[in-house]
């Protein structure tokens, strides 16, 4: 029974790794892209929560993570990122939820529900790919 209980918990990202990424990446984005973050409406954000974002650039996950800090969100990412050993190590430490692209994936849904039950803030980019128009694509049946 205890083994089942432990398996059902989706941990939040590693706090030390998240903090190190924050202090290294935030200044770079500020200098290179002149980023600023509007956190209005996020002051009292706590889990469980599901955040849906349009995927318009390759640094979307960084911008979302920095905006949600000090909360440590759990991201849903494509499983093809897990094929590269250094990236896999990092993503495993960040406790991401992997997803098969462009097909129904019940394991991902179950892991999102486990993350919700664990009180996590889950971030999902529903398009599963970059959009070229800067806003969400229509949802297909």
What are these regions (language model features)?
Residues 1-2, 96:
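Soluble, non-transmembrane catalytic domains of enzymes that act on hydrophobic metabolites at membranes
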Residues 5-24:
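Helix-enriched interaction subdomains in cytosolic or periplasmic regions
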Residues 31-141:
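Soluble catalytic domains of membrane acyltransferases
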């Amino acid at each position: 029974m205890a083994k089942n209980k432990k398996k059902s918990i989706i941990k939040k990202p590693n706090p030390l790794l998240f903090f190190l990424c924050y202090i290294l990446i935030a200044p770079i984005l500020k200098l290179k892209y002149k980023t600023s973050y509007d956190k209005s409406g996020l002051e009292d954000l706590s889990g469980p929560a599901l955040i849906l974002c349009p995927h318009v650039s390759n640094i979307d996950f960084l911008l979302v993570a920095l905006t949600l800090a000090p909360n440590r969100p759990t991201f849903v990412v494509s499983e093809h990122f897990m094929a590269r050993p250094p990236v896999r190590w990092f993503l495993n430490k960040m406790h991401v939820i992997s997803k098969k692209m462009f097909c129904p994936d019940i394991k991902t849904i179950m892991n999102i529900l486990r993350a919700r039950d664990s009180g996590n803030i889950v971030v999902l980019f529903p398009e599963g790919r970059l959009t070229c128009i800067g806003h969400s694509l229509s949802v297909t049946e």
